[in-house]
């Protein structure tokens, strides 16, 4: 078949468009240039020109960012001769009036929108055929907020430039600024300076600058604009008559100014007749953040200040077709401003200020624009009410106000621009697919498809307020929304230094429509910062985390695929309708069909992944909501229950008081009568019987009204539990298993001061020799540190609840909190604080009695929580592979720990001493339920004791699981750590065990920090009891035939309670907490020593040791910004290392620990491989990873 001559065939616009789309989609700028050079010829052809001019429109829909940057750089930003002499207009409008910025905003391509807004020739105020600006095309509120911030920043910079030009009297520069269409829209030459309250015209009238005043009046300055004090510009001129003779220069200037202003006034009066916009009520529209409630904080809302004097808000622009979420009448409102706040202000309305809207702008300039618009509306509304109250309008007022009262609210919303008042009925907004009328079918179809997508997204947006349904499936793609008022920015508004704003309006009347779902309480706190990552970087981003959750993942990719498919199909349909077809057409058709198929596959995959993730997020959110609901219910029930108990106790107290009073009043009469009728002996008996009856009656009443949980005194830790069992006990008081403690093994209450621990048994001697041989204590010759370099804790103050409120129901170990919540210790160092009172284990090893050893081991497991009181600051999360070593010559022990897992976070630890070993894993599951932060310990902990008198076995193995930890008092702003639950400490060698009971912190302080326990032998016979407060001291007592009840005296410590174990059944002190030093971060004296870095120790430390961590060191030095930056850096480095391992297919293995089955408990545990201390001695750490 003979091929047609392509040179004689008319150029096909659909064919060019398909080829251009394919080249743009490939992402290669050289390929794009090659296509234009070969296929887009001749350049002067109308079809070629039409496709070329819309190249940027197509690019923002299908091309990657790199190609768009190249197009802008080569064909938009340059004025030189370009490739093929192509020059593109950044603000080019397609057949629907959309610019590339409109399309990028609609398609949620935030990176493209930001790039375009940074171009010097961009004009974001261009209206499309539906009279919408680009910002009003946004479906994504995050992008709309970003556009608003960039606009405010641009206005601030331009206004400052304008102000400089005014000061320099640079008329040429002033003309160039005003010649920009964007500046003409955004800058208001009649705006007020927020500090002086003057317009630019007022300012130069005061300066008596006739030339500048004339220039201002020629360029739109309003001679009727009043300043803050209500004065017109002409009122600032001194009283002179035109016929007066100019006796001096000042009078001549005043005469000239007066003539100039009067002439401008006369000319302006003509404009008033034809254009009543100059005297309309202030109107404004845009996004503001509104305080919703205590749990959700600030949320972005669309606000409309309409000409009828009402300020209303909606979820977003698309929600304006429905009823507003709340509205205030400006005539009944006042503004409350704080000069220290640049972003926040408050509107007070209603009777006596019962309605308060706390609002927050995205930028100080945006906030000032809103403030002045609202102040103007309040003043205008009040003036109008005064006119209505005093009488009818004057003819001039009737001209400017009479018609507006008859116009509906919705019509007024579309009258904010002179262009809108003359426009026909608004139609649907469509995006660029082609540029002639033959594409109506494809355009409408595409609109319907995208409309459904937008409906679904919009419904998701509505979930953050109260129930809201929108079943209108036929609404247009973009509802015709009112234009954001832009002509309200003062040229003088941008000045260096803080702005002082004062309220000038008072409130007397109630609002028409109260806020329906977002009430504000005076008690609600306004803490900025919703997310951890925001405060980590020192920014304010309230509500953005919530907005990010609305739109879901892959939103930009999905929009690109949808638009690509739509454009491809529409262009393909065009091509198939072209009658002049040849082989090149069919090749392009095949390529296009393959592209569409590929896009459909990608779209289906992304949609499936998106659906799974959205379902997971919805499920998680539902669980979080359920937790909130249950927490509120539990709190309410708890408060009700306690209230009922208080009422019952008060009633009981009153009844008891009445009964006692009655008995006391009757008793003297009984005794008097008895003395008259009988002898003294009989009266004594009767009186005694009466008193006894009274006491019995009182006792019966108390027993009858006693609650089930009131069976013990708050000060008594131990009941007489052995009272019943004592009857079956042996007659002998001393048990055969409880021999008298040998004198030479009498324990000491405090740790020994000398550095040589007395070792007796051969296992102890062997272990001590090993510690010395491996150089465990080398580098620790210096005295321990007793203070920090910081004198006080001056961390930035951030409310704990303000951060945790967005983390309800989540595992906090996987979340990053701001560095200001940290203390300068690592979690590995926190683990080492468990052995602060290791001398208790040294004492335990001195006893022959295994049950007595169990008593002291149990006391040791409870003593490790004393350091947690007043320590709510969070330690630094260890990096994977991070280690920490610690040794004490006075305690003769060495400690080592390693972060062996990152998800879940697990720290393995191993401590060795001649008389004992302590090891285990810190593996916890944490969650926050809205009221408390709960930590559940998952790993087992072990202690190996090598007794001095190892008659039967050389070593004993103990194991236990730590109690549940809870941070309470978060809602009350007084967080504290509490322990609760039962813990069983087991001696697997002898069969002895101890049951410890940690009492949860109750409603009152009674019973706080309380712990009690019982020691049993292998035959379940109770031998010892212990009790006390885990934050202060623990006492022990031997169970004897006389009973086992034990009381705690926090203040007085009798001599009988000291000096070691007592076998006579008296109380003795086992452990007492050390006094806390007054240092920053509430560190203990032991914790102060952990992060110290003496010079002798540095050469022996592994490069992974926590002491060398830069963010932790900066935190200790008070360099909080550096600490935050370093923390972010090391975490990024850790993620990069993980990604590298995944790419190589490597599995991470800890360097110093290996997971095995424990030989006694048969549970998995992390065993120390013993290599660290030898490598430390030889300075052989060259194979350690670089994690810092």
Swiss-Prot record:
GO terms for molecular function: lipid binding; sterol binding; sterol transfer activity. The keyword Manganese does not apply. Ergosterol binds at residues 834, 962. The modification Phosphoserine is found at residues 394, 490, 500, 678, 683, 691, 708, 712. Residues 800-1174 are annotated as: OSBP-related domain (ORD). Residues 415-546, 661-692, 721-755 are annotated as: Disordered. Residues 424-433 have a biased composition (Polar residues). The modification Phosphothreonine is found at residues 692, 694. SUPFAM superfamilies: Ankyrin repeat, Oxysterol-binding protein-like, PH domain-like. One of its GO terms (biological process) is endocytosis. Residues 443-462 have a biased composition (Low complexity). A motif (FFAT) lies at residues 716-722. ANK repeats lie at residues 51-80, 96-125, 196-225. Keywords: ANK repeat, Endoplasmic reticulum, Golgi apparatus, Lipid transport, Lipid-binding, Membrane, Nucleus, Phosphoprotein, Repeat, Transport, Vacuole. Pfam families: Ank (PF00023), Ank_4 (PF13637), Oxysterol_BP (PF01237), PH (PF00169). Belongs to the OSBP family. Interacts with NVJ1. Interacts with the AAA ATPase AFG2; regulates OSH1 membrane association. AFG2 is required for membrane dissociation of OSH1. Interacts with SCS2. This is Oxysterol-binding protein homolog 1. It comes from Saccharomyces cerevisiae (strain ATCC 204508 / S288c). The lineage of its organism: Eukaryota, Fungi, Dikarya, Ascomycota, Saccharomycotina. The gene is SWH1.
């Amino acid at each position: 078949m003979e091929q047609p001559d392509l040179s004689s065939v008319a150029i096909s616009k659909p064919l060019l468009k398909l080829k251009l789309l394919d080249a743009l989609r490939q992402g290669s700028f050289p390929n794009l240039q090659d296509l234009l050079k070969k296929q887009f010829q001749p350049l002067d052809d109308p079809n070629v020109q039409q496709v070329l001019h819309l190249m940027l429109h197509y690019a923002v829909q299908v091309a990657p960012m790199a190609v768009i940057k190249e197009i802008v750089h080569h064909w938009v930003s340059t004025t030189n001769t370009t490739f093929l002499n192509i020059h593109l207009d950044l603000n080019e409008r397609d057949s629907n009036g959309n610019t590339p910025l409109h399309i990028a905003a609609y398609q949620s391509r935030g990176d493209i929108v930001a790039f375009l807004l940074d171009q010097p020739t961009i004009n974001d105020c261009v209206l499309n055929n539906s009279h919408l600006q680009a910002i009003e095309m946004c479906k994504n509120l995050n992008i709309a907020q970003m556009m608003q911030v960039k606009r405010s920043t641009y206005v601030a910079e331009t206004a400052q430039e304008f102000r400089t030009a005014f000061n320099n009297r640079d008329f040429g520069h002033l003309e160039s600024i005003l010649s920009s269409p964007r500046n003409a829209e955004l800058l208001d030459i009649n705006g007020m300076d927020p500090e002086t309250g003057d317009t630019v015209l007022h300012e130069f009238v005061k300066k008596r600058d006739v030339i500048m005043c004339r220039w201002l009046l020629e360029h739109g300055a309003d001679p009727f604009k009043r300043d803050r004090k209500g004065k017109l510009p002409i009122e600032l001129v001194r009283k002179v008559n035109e016929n007066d003779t100019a006796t001096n220069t000042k009078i001549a200037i005043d005469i000239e100014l007066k003539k100039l202003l009067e002439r401008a006034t006369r000319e302006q009066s003509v404009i008033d007749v034809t254009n009543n916009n100059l005297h309309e009520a202030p109107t404004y529209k845009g996004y503001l953040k509104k305080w919703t409630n205590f749990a959700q904080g600030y949320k972005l809302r669309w606000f409309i200040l309409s000409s009828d004097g009402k300020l209303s808000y909606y979820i977003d622009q698309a929600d304006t077709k429905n009823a507003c979420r709340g509205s205030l009448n400006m005539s009944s409102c006042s503004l409350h401003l704080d000069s220290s706040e640049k972003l926040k202000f408050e509107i007070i309305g209603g009777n006596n200020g019962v309605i308060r809207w706390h609002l927050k702008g995205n930028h100080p300039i945006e906030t000032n624009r809103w403030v002045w618009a609202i102040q103007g509306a309040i003043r205008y509304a009040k003036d109008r009410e005064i006119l209505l109250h005093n009488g009818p309008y004057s003819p001039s007022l009737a001209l400017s106000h009479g018609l507006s009262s008859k116009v509906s609210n919705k019509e007024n919303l579309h009258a904010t621009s002179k262009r809108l008042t003359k426009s026909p009925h608004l139609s649907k907004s469509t995006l660029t697919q082609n540029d002639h009328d033959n594409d109506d079918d494809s355009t409408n179809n595409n609109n319907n498809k995208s409309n459904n997508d937008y409906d679904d997204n919009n419904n998701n947006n509505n979930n953050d307020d109260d129930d809201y349904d929108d079943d209108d499936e036929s609404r247009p793609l973009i509802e015709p929304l009112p234009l954001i008022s832009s002509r309200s920015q003062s040229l003088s508004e941008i000045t260096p230094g803080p702005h002082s704003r004062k309220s000038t309006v008072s409130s007397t009347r109630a609002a028409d429509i109260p806020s329906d779902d977002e009430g504000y309480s005076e008690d609600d706190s306004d803490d900025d910062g919703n997310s951890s990552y925001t405060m980590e970087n020192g920014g304010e981003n309230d509500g953005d985390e919530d907005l990010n959750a609305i739109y879901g993942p892959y939103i930009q990719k999905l929009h690109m695929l949808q638009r690509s498919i739509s454009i491809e199909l529409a262009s393909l349909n065009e091509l198939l309708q072209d009658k002049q077809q040849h082989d090149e057409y069919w090749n392009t058709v095949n390529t296009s069909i393959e592209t569409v198929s590929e896009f459909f596959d990608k779209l289906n995959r992304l949609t499936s992944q998106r659906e799974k993730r959205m379902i997971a997020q919805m499920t998680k959110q539902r669980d979080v909501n359920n937790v909130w609901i249950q927490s509120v219910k539990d709190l309410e029930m708890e408060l009700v229950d306690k209230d009922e108990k208080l009422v019952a106790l008060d009633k009981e107290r009153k009844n008891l008081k009445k009964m006692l009073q009655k008995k006391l009043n009757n008793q003297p009469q009984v005794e008097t009568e008895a003395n008259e009728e009988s002898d003294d002996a009989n009266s004594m008996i009767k009186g005694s019987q009466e008193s006894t009856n009274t006491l019995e009656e009182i006792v019966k009443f108390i027993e009858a009204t006693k609650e089930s949980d009131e069976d013990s005194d708050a000060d008594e830790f131990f009941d007489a539990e052995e009272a019943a069992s004592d009857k079956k006990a042996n007659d002998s008081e001393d048990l055969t298993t409880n021999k008298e403690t040998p004198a030479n093994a009498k324990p000491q209450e405090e740790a020994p001061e000398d550095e040589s621990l007395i070792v007796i048994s051969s296992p102890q001697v062997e272990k001590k020799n090993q510690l010395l041989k491996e150089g465990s204590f080398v580098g620790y010759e210096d005295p321990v540190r007793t203070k920090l370099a910081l004198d006080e804790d001056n961390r930035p103050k951030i409310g704990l609840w303000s951060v945790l409120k967005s983390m309800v129901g989540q595992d906090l170990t996987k979340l990053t909190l701001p560095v200001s919540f940290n203390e300068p210790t690592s979690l590995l160092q926190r683990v080492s604080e468990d052995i602060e009172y290791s001398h208790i284990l040294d004492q335990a090893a001195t006893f022959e009695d295994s049950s007595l050893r169990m008593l002291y081991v149990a006391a040791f497991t409870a003593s490790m929580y004393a350091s947690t009181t007043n320590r709510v600051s969070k330690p630094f999360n260890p990096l994977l592979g991070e280690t920490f070593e610690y040794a004490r010559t006075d305690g003769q022990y060495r400690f080592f720990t390693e972060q062996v897992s990152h998800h879940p976070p697990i720290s393995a630890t191993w401590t060795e001493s001649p008389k004992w070993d302590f090891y285990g894993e810190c593996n916890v599951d944490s969650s926050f339920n809205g009221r408390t932060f709960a930590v559940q310990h998952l790993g087992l902990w072990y202690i190996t004791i090598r007794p001095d008198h190892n008659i039967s076995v050389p070593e004993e193995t103990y194991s236990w699981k730590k109690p549940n930890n809870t941070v309470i008092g978060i809602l009350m702003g007084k967080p504290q750590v509490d322990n609760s639950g039962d813990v069983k400490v087991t001696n697997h060698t002898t069969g002895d065990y101890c049951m410890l009971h940690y009492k949860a912190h109750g409603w009152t302080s009674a019973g706080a920090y309380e712990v009690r326990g019982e020691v049993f032998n292998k035959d379940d016979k109770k031998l010892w009891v212990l009790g006390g407060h885990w934050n202060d001291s623990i006492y022990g007592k031997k169970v004897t035939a006389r009973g086992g009840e034990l009381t705690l005296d926090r203040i007085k410590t009798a001599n009988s309670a000291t000096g070691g174990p007592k076998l006579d059944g008296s109380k003795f002190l086992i452990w007492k907490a050390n006094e806390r030093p007054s240092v920053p971060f509430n560190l203990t004296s032991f914790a102060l020593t952990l992060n110290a870095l003496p010079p002798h120790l540095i050469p022996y430390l592994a490069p992974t040791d926590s002491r060398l961590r830069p963010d932790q060191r900066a935190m200790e030095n008070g360099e909080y910004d550096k600490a935050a930056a370093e923390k972010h850096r090391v975490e990024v480095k850790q993620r990069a290392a993980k990604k590298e391992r995944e790419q190589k297919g490597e599995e991470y293995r800890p360097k110093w620990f290996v997971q095995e089955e424990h030989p006694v408990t048969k549970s998995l545990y992390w065993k120390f491989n013993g290599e660290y201390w030898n490598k430390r001695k030889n300075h052989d750490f060259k194979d350690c990873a670089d994690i810092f």
